[in-house]
Protein backbone atom coordinates (compact mmCIF):
# COMPACT_ATOMS: atom_id res chain seq x y z
CA UNK A 1 0.00 0.00 0.00
CA UNK A 2 1.31 3.45 -0.91
CA UNK A 3 2.18 6.00 1.73
CA UNK A 4 -0.45 8.73 2.10
CA UNK A 5 0.86 12.21 2.70
CA UNK A 6 -1.54 14.78 4.09
CA UNK A 7 -0.46 17.83 2.09
CA UNK A 8 -3.70 18.19 0.15
CA UNK A 9 -5.86 17.81 3.25
CA UNK A 10 -3.69 20.24 5.23
CA UNK A 11 -3.88 22.84 2.44
CA UNK A 12 -7.68 22.45 2.30
CA UNK A 13 -7.96 22.87 6.06
CA UNK A 14 -5.70 25.93 6.07
CA UNK A 15 -7.63 27.55 3.22
CA UNK A 16 -10.92 26.91 5.04
CA UNK A 17 -9.69 28.58 8.23
CA UNK A 18 -8.05 31.50 6.42
CA UNK A 19 -11.24 32.06 4.42
CA UNK A 20 -13.24 32.20 7.66
CA UNK A 21 -10.70 34.71 9.06
CA UNK A 22 -10.95 37.01 6.05
CA UNK A 23 -11.25 40.63 7.13
CA UNK A 24 -9.56 40.10 10.50
CA UNK A 25 -6.76 42.50 11.48
CA UNK A 26 -3.09 41.72 10.88
CA UNK A 27 -1.78 38.21 11.47
CA UNK A 28 -5.26 37.03 12.43
CA UNK A 29 -6.17 36.99 8.74
CA UNK A 30 -2.82 35.74 7.36
CA UNK A 31 -1.11 33.32 9.77
CA UNK A 32 -2.86 29.96 10.08
CA UNK A 33 -1.94 29.36 13.71
CA UNK A 34 -3.24 32.76 14.82
CA UNK A 35 -6.21 32.73 12.44
CA UNK A 36 -7.36 29.35 13.77
CA UNK A 37 -7.52 30.71 17.33
CA UNK A 38 -9.26 33.88 16.13
CA UNK A 39 -11.90 31.87 14.24
CA UNK A 40 -12.54 29.62 17.26
CA UNK A 41 -12.89 32.63 19.56
CA UNK A 42 -15.17 34.39 17.07
CA UNK A 43 -17.38 31.30 17.03
CA UNK A 44 -17.57 31.32 20.82
CA UNK A 45 -18.52 35.00 20.86
CA UNK A 46 -21.14 34.45 18.15
CA UNK A 47 -22.68 31.51 20.04
CA UNK A 48 -22.77 33.42 23.32
CA UNK A 49 -24.04 36.66 21.83
CA UNK A 50 -26.92 35.03 19.97
CA UNK A 51 -28.26 34.27 23.43
CA UNK A 52 -27.25 37.62 24.96
CA UNK A 53 -29.05 39.44 22.12
CA UNK A 54 -32.37 38.02 23.32
CA UNK A 55 -31.73 39.31 26.86
CA UNK A 56 -30.67 42.73 25.58
CA UNK A 57 -33.77 43.16 23.44
CA UNK A 58 -36.07 42.10 26.27
CA UNK A 59 -34.40 44.67 28.54
CA UNK A 60 -34.78 47.35 25.85
CA UNK A 61 -38.47 46.52 25.40
CA UNK A 62 -39.08 46.68 29.16
CA UNK A 63 -37.30 50.06 29.36
CA UNK A 64 -39.43 51.48 26.55
CA UNK A 65 -42.68 50.11 28.03
CA UNK A 66 -41.77 51.46 31.47
CA UNK A 67 -40.99 54.93 30.12
CA UNK A 68 -44.27 55.23 28.23
CA UNK A 69 -46.41 53.63 30.95
CA UNK A 70 -44.98 56.05 33.54
CA UNK A 71 -46.03 58.89 31.22
CA UNK A 72 -49.53 57.35 31.35
CA UNK A 73 -49.44 57.14 35.17
CA UNK A 74 -48.50 53.49 35.83
CA UNK A 75 -45.21 51.77 36.54
CA UNK A 76 -44.09 48.85 34.40
CA UNK A 77 -44.87 46.28 37.08
CA UNK A 78 -48.33 47.75 37.71
CA UNK A 79 -49.03 47.70 33.96
CA UNK A 80 -48.03 44.03 33.62
CA UNK A 81 -50.09 43.12 36.70
CA UNK A 82 -53.09 44.99 35.27
CA UNK A 83 -52.75 43.28 31.88
CA UNK A 84 -52.64 39.88 33.56
CA UNK A 85 -55.75 40.75 35.59
CA UNK A 86 -57.54 41.97 32.46
CA UNK A 87 -56.52 38.77 30.59
CA UNK A 88 -54.80 40.82 27.89
CA UNK A 89 -52.07 38.72 26.28
CA UNK A 90 -49.56 41.03 24.59
CA UNK A 91 -45.87 40.23 24.67
CA UNK A 92 -43.27 42.84 25.53
CA UNK A 93 -42.12 43.26 21.93
CA UNK A 94 -45.64 44.23 20.82
CA UNK A 95 -46.15 46.50 23.83
CA UNK A 96 -42.83 48.25 23.13
CA UNK A 97 -43.78 48.75 19.47
CA UNK A 98 -47.11 50.26 20.55
CA UNK A 99 -45.32 52.49 23.06
CA UNK A 100 -42.96 53.83 20.38
CA UNK A 101 -45.06 53.92 17.21
CA UNK A 102 -48.74 54.03 18.30
CA UNK A 103 -49.06 55.97 21.52
CA UNK A 104 -52.86 56.17 21.31
CA UNK A 105 -53.21 52.39 21.18
CA UNK A 106 -50.73 52.05 24.05
CA UNK A 107 -52.75 54.55 26.08
CA UNK A 108 -55.87 52.44 25.47
CA UNK A 109 -54.05 49.32 26.69
CA UNK A 110 -52.88 51.20 29.80
CA UNK A 111 -56.46 52.37 30.44
CA UNK A 112 -57.67 48.74 30.31
CA UNK A 113 -54.91 47.74 32.74
CA UNK A 114 -55.84 50.61 35.09
CA UNK A 115 -59.51 49.61 35.10
CA UNK A 116 -58.57 45.97 35.79
CA UNK A 117 -56.39 47.05 38.73
CA UNK A 118 -59.17 49.27 40.12
CA UNK A 119 -61.75 46.47 39.93
Curated annotation (Swiss-Prot):
InterPro entries: Ribosomal_bL20, RIBOSOMAL_L20_CS, Ribosomal_protein_bL20_C
Alphabetical keyword list: Ribonucleoprotein, Ribosomal protein, RNA-binding, rRNA-binding
One MF annotation (Gene Ontology) recorded for this entry: rRNA binding
Domain of life: Bacteria
Database matches in CDD domains: Ribosomal_L20 (cd07026)
GO CC terms of this entry: ribonucleoprotein complex; ribosome
Entry keyword Nucleus: no
Any one GO BP annotation for this protein: translation
Function: Binds directly to 23S ribosomal RNA and is necessary for the in vitro assembly process of the 50S ribosomal subunit. It is not involved in the protein synthesizing functions of that subunit.
Family matches, as PANTHER family: 39S RIBOSOMAL PROTEIN L20
Protein family membership: Belongs to the bacterial ribosomal protein bL20 family.
Protein name: Large ribosomal subunit protein bL20
Organism whose genome encodes this protein: Cellvibrio japonicus (strain Ueda107) (Pseudomonas fluorescens subsp. cellulosa)
Gene name, Swiss-Prot/TrEMBL: rplT
Amino acid sequence: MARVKRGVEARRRHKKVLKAAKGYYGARSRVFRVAKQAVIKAGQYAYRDRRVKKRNFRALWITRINAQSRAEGLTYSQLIAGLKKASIVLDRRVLADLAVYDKAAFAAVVAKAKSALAA
